[in-house]
């Protein structure tokens, strides 16, 4: 807390506060130089596990081939279904409540990637698929991510609750797209 107050009083740019250390210096234009590192771009958060995965800084996560340059896809570490994938924007976006109307295409692209990944894994019964987002404060990671689950008819009791269609804590991708358009 004291370090944060010192950093604010030193005139650090807001982007630099998170990476500021005792060795931080401020140049005449107010840029951040923490141990020789440049400030993080606003679309990257070094404390976010999904940002690190997108930046290929987590060698333990296998990225699935994704033909969209703005998105990544990988298997959920605690799968609720035989096919449980996460489709994640490379740029840091907080959650589904922070989305704007002009980001409908992003969500549509996430759904397209999810369907493509399922097809590549020989799952084509799209009537037995659930795609959606957890609503804050029920997001385990504060980086937008689409859950792609199949087959839905084989979800366990708890998973049926956790991924319940358009509940207080989970919204389907189709419903989110509809809400963003209105």
Curated annotation (Swiss-Prot):
Cited Gene3D superfamilies: HIT-like (3.30.428.10)
Consequence when changing residue 36 to A: 2.5-fold increase in affinity for indolepropinoic acyl-adenylate and cytosine; 2-fold decrease in hypoxanthine affinity; nearly no change in affinity for adenine, guanine and uracil
Coiled-coil regions listed: none
An annotated GO cellular component: nucleus
Top-level taxon: Eukaryota
Cell location: Cytoplasm; Nucleus
Cystine bridges: none
Protein name: Adenosine 5'-monophosphoramidase HINT3
Gene name per UniProt: HINT3
């Amino acid at each position: 807390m004291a370090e944060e107050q010192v950093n604010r009083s030193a005139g650090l740019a807001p982007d630099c506060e998170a990476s500021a250390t005792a060795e931080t210096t401020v140049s005449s234009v107010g840029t951040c130089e923490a141990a020789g590192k440049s400030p993080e771009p606003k679309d990257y958060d070094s404390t976010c596990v999904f940002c690190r995965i997108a930046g290929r800084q987590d060698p333990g996560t296998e990225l699935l081939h994704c033909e969209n340059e703005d998105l990544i896809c990988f298997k959920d570490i605690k799968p609720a279904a035989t096919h449980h994938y996460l489709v994640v924007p490379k740029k840091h976006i907080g959650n589904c409540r922070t989305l704007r109307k002009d980001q409908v295409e992003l969500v549509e692209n996430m759904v397209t990637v999810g369907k493509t990944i399922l097809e590549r894994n020989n799952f084509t019964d799209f009537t037995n698929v659930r795609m959606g987002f957890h609503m804050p404060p029920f997001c385990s990671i504060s980086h937008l991510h689409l859950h792609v689950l199949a087959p839905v008819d084989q979800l366990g009791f708890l998973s049926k609750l956790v991924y319940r269609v358009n509940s207080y804590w989970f919204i389907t991708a189709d419903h989110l797209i509809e809400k963003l358009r209105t």
